[in-house]
Curated annotation (Swiss-Prot):
E.C. numbers: 6.5.1.2
Organism of derivation: Blochmanniella floridana
Protein name: DNA ligase
Gene Ontology biological process: DNA repair; DNA replication
Role, per record: DNA ligase that catalyzes the formation of phosphodiester linkages between 5'-phosphoryl and 3'-hydroxyl groups in double-stranded DNA using NAD as a coenzyme and as the energy source for the reaction. It is essential for DNA replication and repair of damaged DNA.
Residues annotated as catalytic: K120
Length: 594
């Protein structure tokens, strides 16, 4: 029984972490399929052992995934997710359940349930509240009950009306809560990444992440320049004298008349067979669309039936997302390079002949660990099948062994760090996790740690990007984070293409960065296993950096939001002499904790 409890806890922590990355950080670490498998495993365990169910479980609610840098807004009605299906049999089962549940209350035609079929646009869900036709506020999904306030940014998006249109003496609802999707077109996404690349900034991995990151900008002017588009997909709440149609499609047409954009590919069908025809049709035209989609959404059109079927903890019972299978492409493996990460983790990166999957050019694939190279029996020159899982994460599925060339080269697993030459340690024999233990004496780790420290979510030193940090380290001008605060104009003028104005701007950014929240400072330290969420909680628990540094191991082990390994990592990191001296040096740099 203890093993079952441990597995449930591991699944919950993993799902919460993935939801936080997806909704707040705009990052996708696993494919949709992998996420769904984890969620389904947790659902099955909780079904078998119902006494293990908790309110915070991912099966019962959407995790608390709000960005702390944004204010929060409570939705009028919970903003739920959608259950996903991936094959015809699951669609038929969905239709069968709908008919069974409705037949208990209504005399329905068993063969002619009316469905509204829509494209599943790959973007960010948005809730907008109008009061007497005027936009009051807008919020992201958040945890489903409370979302992030993005009103200022939404006001900068042209496709969202600030005031609803009305014809002659038409009555508008006193309150109207609209739900829809914020997304970016393929063309705008390509242009945005070109601009990011030319300015030396990190590009977005996919259009969904670009839309999410653009919507959450602290500067609305940046959002305005990102060419975001809004598409309304429903009304979640209304109040007042205005009566709305009992048809979902009828309500969408009404929204369109009021000035809200709706999708051009919506179809109303009777029965489940036309739903399959719509699915197959959309798959054929998918590549021709101006924006990314990852499936279709099927909803019961009758709003009375919707109310009768109700909602689960995570998703409505009257709708489902029918996802497309991942796209596959054949290509050639040209090289495997072993990269040293910020914490010393050695990651194999596979470089391939470029292939286009889902309108994204794939040139390299993260292999995660050495075991993947061994499992796939990879050799340089092999023909490989690449999958863009969930249309997000590139992955090498397998090799075509019969296509292996005579001059294919064996991939040598490193014994020494590619950066500093230190002997690598095997941390996990099962997955062959390799790590360099040289820490900041390793040049690659030092650069990565300094980049992390200066990044936007950490110290947020504007202008201190990868190119600048690489030069500062290579020229011996900085070695530890403390060195950022002893930089002078004279030192900065040693950098390539750096003039007086650039140096003065960067020094001003360093000065501004000294005023920081405790949570951002903890995150900036780069403690293994401590991301933004844990940093926020540690800051809340300990209040000051002195309290955190003086805490004993038992104090960390008692924290409910981290496990034993994370607790030991935090304690060890804070009490390692170099780290301790580094933190003390940073405190002496006159940081102001706000």
């Amino acid at each position: 029984m203890k093993l079952i409890k441990n597995r449930v806890q591991i699944l919950r922590e993993r799902l919460n972490y993935l939801e936080y990355l997806y909704y707040v950080k705009s990052e996708s670490k696993v494919s949709d399929e992998e996420y769904d498998i984890l969620l389904e495993e947790l659902r099955q365990l909780e079904f078998k052992y119902p006494y293990l169910i908790t309110k915070s479980s991912s099966t019962q609610s959407i995790s608390n995934v709000c960005d702390n840098s944004l204010n929060r807004i409570r939705h009028q009605k919970p903003m739920l997710s959608l259950n996903s299906i991936r094959d015809k049999s699951q669609l038929l089962l969905f239709d069968k359940r709908i008919k069974y549940k409705l037949s208990n209350h209504y005399n329905i035609n068993q063969n002619l349930i009316v469905y509204c079929c829509e494209l599943k646009i790959d973007g960010v869900a948005l809730s907008i509240l109008y009061k007497q036709g005027k936009l009051v506020h807008a919020a992201t999904r958040g945890d489903g009950k409370i979302g992030e306030n993005v009103t200022k940014n939404v006001n900068a998006i042209d496709s969202i009306p600030k005031n609803l249109k009305k014809n002659n003496n038409e009555i508008l609802p006193d309150l109207l809560e609209i739900r829809g999707e914020i997304f970016i077109s393929k063309l705008s996404f390509s242009k945005l990444n070109q601009e990011m690349l030319s300015s030396g900034k990190k590009v977005f991995s996919n259009a969904r992440n670009a839309a999410s990151g653009s919507l959450r900008q602290l500067d609305p002017h940046v959002t305005e320049l990102r060419s975001l588009v809004f598409c309304c997909y429903g009304i979640s709440y209304y109040a007042g004298l205005k009566q709305l149609p009992n048809s979902h499609w009828g309500r969408l047409k009404l929204c369109n008349r009021w000035g809200l954009s709706i999708n051009n590919y919506i179809q109303i069908v009777s029965g489940i067979d036309p739903v399959l025809e719509y699915y197959n049709y959309v798959r054929k035209i998918r590549s021709e669309l101006e924006y990314q989609i990852d499936g279709i959404v099927i909803k019961i059109d009758n709003c009375i039936y919707q109310d009768q079927l109700g909602c689960g903890f995570r998703a409505p019972n009257w709708a489902v997302a029918y996802k497309f299978p991942a796209e596959l492409k054949l290509t050639k493996l040209n090289d495997v390079v072993f990269k040293v990460g910020r914490t010393g983790l050695i990651t194999p990166i596979a470089y391939i002949n470029p292939v286009v999957i889902g309108n994204v050019i794939i040139k390299k694939v993260n292999m995660h660990n050495v075991n993947e190279v061994k499992r796939l029996n990879l050799m340089i020159g092999d023909t490989v099948i690449v999958q863009r899982s969930g249309d997000v994460i590139p992955k090498i599925l397998k090799i075509i062994l019969e296509n292996r060339v005579d001059n294919a080269k064996f991939i040598k697993i490193p014994e020494f760090c590619p950066s500093c030459g230190s002997i690598l340690k095997v941390e996990d024999n099962k997955s062959s996790v390799l790590r360099c233990l040289a820490k900041l004496t390793c040049l690659a780790q030092r650069k990565s740690a300094l980049k992390h420290f200066a990044s936007r979510k950490a110290m947020n030193i504007q202008g201190m990007g990868s190119r600048v940090i690489n030069q500062l380290v290579d020229k011996g001008l900085i070695c530890t984070p403390v060195d950022f605060f002893s930089l002078s104009k004279e030192k900065l003028l040693c950098l390539d293409r750096y003039g007086e104005k650039s140096a003065e701007r960067l020094l001003q950014s360093i000065l501004i960065a000294k005023e920081i929240t405790l949570s951002a400072f903890i995150y900036a330290l780069g403690i293994p296993g401590v991301g933004e969420s844990v940093s926020n909680k540690l800051a809340y628990m300990y209040r000051t950096i002195e309290n955190l540094m003086n805490a004993d191991l038992q104090s960390f082990l008692q924290l409910k939001f981290i496990g034993k390994i994370a607790a030991m990592n935090i304690y060890s990191f804070l009490h390692q002499s170099d780290n301790y001296n580094n933190i003390q040096g940073l405190i002496r740099s006159n940081l102001i904790f706000k």
